[in-house]
Structures are given as C-alpha cells and as structure tokens.
C-alpha cells in the first residue's frame, strides 16, 4: 500500500504504465514502451507535439547505422575509437559500448515505427577529422518521410529538405492510434511524485502537472521518462551553468529546464551541465531572418516553422 507521507495524492487523475515528460526525442522511448505493450501517457507543455526536434532538420549522428553498414562504410573499432576520443574521459566504457550497440537499433526502430527511411546527410556531417576513427559522410543521417506541416517544418532553411517532423509526427501518431497511448498537450510537468517503499527507499510513482484547468496527478506504475528538453529559456539556469553568455537559443520556448529541476528535487545527480551543442552566429541588425527564427516557436513563426 502506498505511503502518503511523501506526497502521494489521494486520487489519481490519470493512470498508465509509463509517463513520458516531453514529446521531442523522448518519443523514441515512448514509442518503444508503447510497442512493448505498455500504456503510455505523454505530457507536453506546448500546444503541439514534437518539441525542438520537430523544428530541427531531423538529422542525427549515429555510427554503425544500417544505411552506412549496408555498404560497409563504417567499422565498430573505428567508431569506438572516435567516440572514446571525443568523450575525453567524461563517459564510461559501458556507456560508450551501449551507445554503439543500441543506438543503431533505435534508428531502425524509428524507421519502422514512423514509416520513414534514413539517408546519409547530403550536406552537414558533424565530426572532427583530427580524432582517430573519424569518417566523413557516413555517420550523420537524415530522415526521409512524409512532410508534416502541423508539427513544424524546416525545409530548405539550411540547404536540406529533411525535417524533424518526419520523425515526431508519425511516431506520435503511431503511439496514439496504433498502440493506444495518450498525449496531454498544454500540460506542464512540475513535480515527480514519490513514495517510500517497503525497503525504505524513495521511488518515483508519478508526475504532477499543471493545466489550464488546474493540477493533475498522473500515476506511472513502471517508469517516468524525463525528456523535457534543455534550459534555453531559463535565464537563471543559463547563468548558473553556462560558462559563456548564451543570448539566443534554437530551442522552443517550453524548454525551461523543468525536467532537470524535477530530477534534482528528488536527489538526481547532474553531469555535463556546461556542455551544449551550439554555433557561432554573426548578427546583422539590418537583415537577420536567422536571428529572428532562433527566437520563434513553431506556432508563431511567419514561415510556418
């Protein structure tokens, strides 16, 4: 029987096996759980699914992907040497091995579940030539799928016609319509609900969230997956963790660090907080469409992004 002393509510508004906070890249975990037969509820702060992933160009960096391996373009030893060098001692052999083992499987799962294919990126390839095991035009892949105007589209903005919405839109659709999952939009997760089990250990049993109608409590019998994005729109967290000023962000405006703060509140450790993917941008005050795009969430961008 649950112990209410740690904040377990007397009544649950929703119940599921796996509660997922966010709807960008974390949809991969949501989709995997749903495909395995778990009842999934996705909690999304925005009024549409996809997060920053939907407004991206959809490309991902994955060694040993099936597209490259079909032509024997990659090698596990080379890939391991490369990611070991780039990790620079900030990871573990076990994590690096798991990335190379299960990462390509995740890419194949997305292709099957979201009804898309992957191609070697025709333009952008993120890598450092100076590191051992580096390869060009092999490991950065882009989704090829059906255009989704609802989830957000970045066609042609940076010389590519790929879109993150090729992944997020059909994946979310499959979670709901194929596997019976549920998506709660305009629902902002605020707190992890915990209890003390019979062994005296604190465990997460659900999520408390805020909606326009008030507070809701969502029970998760198996797991809560946090994937609510970064903290690009939280000035206090940027001052705390970033070593240089970060005045602009390409994250959607719902990325305020809630997932990180919720984890901290129940004792989770943090790592690599000062590190982020970024790029140097020269701002021309007279003509700055890119600059404006960085601050525009999908629902407000004049170009429909």
Indicate where each model-derived feature is located:
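N-terminal Rossmann-like FAD-binding beta1-loop-alpha1 element of flavoenzymes
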Residues: 16-42
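Extreme N-terminal leader/targeting segments of oxidoreductases
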Residues: 1-18, 35, 169
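Glycine-rich FAD pyrophosphate-binding loop
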Residues: 35-56
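Conserved redox-cofactor binding core of oxidoreductases
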Residues: 100-214, 235-236, 283-284
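Glycine-rich loop(s) and the adjacent beta-strand/alpha-helix scaffold that form part
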Residues: 162, 211-289
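FAD cofactor-binding and catalytic pocket of flavoenzymes
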Residues: 282-305
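Glycine-rich active-site loop/strand segments that organize a redox cofactor
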Residues: 61-99
């Amino acid at each position: 029987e649950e112990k209410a002393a740690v904040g377990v509510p007397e009544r649950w508004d929703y119940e599921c096996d796996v509660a997922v906070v966010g709807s960008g890249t974390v949809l991969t975990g949501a989709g995997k759980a749903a495909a395995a037969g778990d009842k999934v509820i996705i909690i999304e702060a925005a009024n549409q699914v996809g997060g920053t992933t939907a407004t991206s160009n959809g490309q991902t960096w994955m060694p040993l992907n099936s597209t490259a391996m079909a032509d024997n373009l990659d090698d596990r030893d080379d890939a391991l040497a490369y990611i070991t060098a780039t990790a620079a001692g900030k990871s573990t052999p076990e994590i690096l091995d798991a990335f190379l083992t299960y990462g390509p499987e995740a890419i194949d799962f997305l292709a099957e579940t979201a009804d898309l294919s992957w191609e070697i990126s025709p333009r952008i390839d993120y890598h450092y030539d100076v590191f051992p095991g580096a390869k060009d035009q092999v490991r950065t892949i882009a989704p090829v799928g059906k255009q989704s105007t609802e989830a957000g589209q970045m066609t042609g903005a940076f010389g590519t016609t790929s879109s993150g919405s090729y992944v997020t839109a059909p994946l979310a659709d499959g979670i709901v319509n194929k596997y019976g999952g549920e998506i709660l939009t305009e629902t902002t997760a605020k707190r992890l609900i915990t209890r003390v089990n019979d062994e005296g250990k604190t465990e997460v049993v659900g999520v408390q969230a805020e909606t326009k109608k008030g507070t809701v409590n969502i029970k998760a019998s198996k797991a809560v997956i946090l994937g609510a994005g970064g903290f690009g729109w939280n000035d206090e967290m940027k001052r705390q963790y970033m070593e240089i000023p970060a005045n602009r962000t390409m994250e959607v405006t719902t990325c305020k660090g809630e997932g990180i703060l919720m984890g901290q509140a129940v004792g989770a450790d943090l790592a690599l907080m000062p590190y982020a993917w970024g790029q140097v941008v020269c701002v021309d005050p007279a003509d700055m469409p890119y600059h404006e795009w960085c601050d525009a969430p999908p629902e407000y961008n004049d170009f429909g992004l």
